[in-house]
Amino acid sequence: MPRPRVLLVHGSVVNGDATWAAQRPLATRFELVIPNRRGFPPGPDVESVDYEDEAAWLDPLMAPGTHVVGHSYGGVIALFAAARRPELVRSLTVVEPPALAVARGNPAADAFAAGAEELWEHGPREPEAFLRGFLTAVNAPIPSGAFSPALLQGARTLMVERYPWRAEIPLLELAATPFPKLVVSGGHSAAFDAVCDVLEERLGAERAVLPGAGHAVQRLGEPFNELLAAFVERAEAR
């Protein structure tokens, strides 16, 4: 009997292999599909990144019955991918997507979006300095010592992303889809919690908060894996 297919879409800075390393144990239960998006090692640099274009790029990976999971910028991509090809989606999970526009009017979300706009429009143009500013903003650890070539490539790709805080998420289309949704945050940021709370309400999604790893909730390993596995298995049983 084939295992459920789980497509794991990584976000900014690091590739799929690095983002989802703690999810490798799930390969005993599911077919894990972990692409490295364009602009990330081992591929070359890119001139621009667009979440809607990235959603279309996922089309060949979305076989019928796919469970789509996205972290951060990958969560924004996953939302568009699921709305684009709902007939292929068995479930949708997003982890702290920076879709700040859905929570417009929330003070924390508005402040985060303004800070991101300032960083991208007027921040440092040197990749390492830019990445330090970004990691600080999302409450992620800053590596000690010199940044690796892979991180610097991730920083260059980060700098040319289409702004996710301006994304107009297709909430009505997604709310009308029959597949279950799960929204996860790390309990470290009022802005990300606000986004996730709106997605829970507007999409009729399940909601979970897993503290301890900041923005990179999936790096918790077993607690996240058990949450995701239980959700996928419930979706399979529907």
Language-model features and meaning:
Residues 31-67:
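Active-site loop/oxyanion-hole signature of alpha/beta-hydrolase fold enzymes
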Residues 83-121:
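Flexible "cap/lid" loop of the alpha/beta hydrolase fold
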Residues 124-159:
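Conserved alpha/beta-hydrolase catalytic His-Asp/Glu region
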